[in-house]
Structures are given as C-alpha cells and as structure tokens.
C-alpha cells in the first residue's frame, strides 16, 4: 500500500497509476517505454518489507527496479559491532535484491545516526538523479523511526531539487504503529 505525493504539499493525494503495482504492462509503461522504479529505504530490508511485492510486480512487467539503502544497517543486530552488522545486513540486502532481480545501491549514512545536512541532501539527490527514475517510493514522513523521517525528507527534497521529474510515492512501515496517519491512495 502506498500514497502518492502531490506537487503542492507532501501529503496531498492525487490520482496515481491505475492498479499500481499490478503485473500489467499498461500500468508500468509510458509511450511504450517501461518505467523505472526506485525504492529508497533507510535500512537494508525496508524497501523489501514495505513494498517488495510492488518491486516484484514491476520487475515481472519488465521494468528496471533499483533499491537505494540510506544506511548499511550498522545498528541492526544486537551484540554485533557496527562493522559486523553492516557486513551481514549488506549481504542480506544484496541477496534479497538478487531474488527480486533488483539493483542495490548503498549510501553512506550510519544506522541510528542519520542526519539532514547539505552534504546528505546532495548525496541523496545525486543517487536518485543517477538512476533517472520515473517513479520513486520512500518512507512516509510521519513515522516514529527517526531514520525513516530523515530518509523521507531527503527524498522529498531531491524530488523538488530535480524539478519534480519523477512521481513520488510513500510506503508504510508495517511494524504496528510506526507509520502514523497513513492512508493509502494506491495499492
């Protein structure tokens, strides 16, 4: 389940792709060209657990899909050092991407210490611009996890700075009450 961003306000709901994410080439192409989907998550496993089915549907329809991870999951495993956790989580994410036939891209933020700075805005904008997406999906901005909020803000800013050149959608973190006030507009 996802929610589309509006150009005027981050939470504005506008009409999205009909039957978004279904395995239907008519919904994932423009003028005969397959759309490129980029999913941006704060941590390894966020893209897959939040919208892995949508990613797979786009791949099955012949579209290129990229998963951008803002961190390497350094704080993701209790009892492990940041380096140990990162090595495990990167391997898991890379393996998940192989299963889904998705390209992984890892950025340089640190899990649990994500920040919004000029340099981080630039890093996110450049990573997204390099992929030339038609559609980007990222975290809903009203989320109890601070890394998810940072990720959402950086992606939203990239959308603006790149001149609204791609459709922006938000995904819900399926962990209970983590995503707040999220009402999907597309499925």
Descriptions of predicted regions:
Residues 45, 71, 93, 104, ...:
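Divalent metal-coordination and catalytic microenvironments
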Residues 73-80, 113, 176-180:
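A short acidic, helix-capping loop that chelates divalent metal ions and anchors anionic groups
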Residues 37-44, 48-82:
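ATP-dependent adenylation/pyrophosphate-handling site
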Residues 75-100:
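Glycine-rich phosphate-binding loop and adjoining beta1-alpha1-beta2 segment
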Residues 65, 104, 166-168:
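Hydrophobic anchor at the start of a short beta-strand
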Residues 70, 97-112:
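A conserved beta-strand->alpha-helix junction
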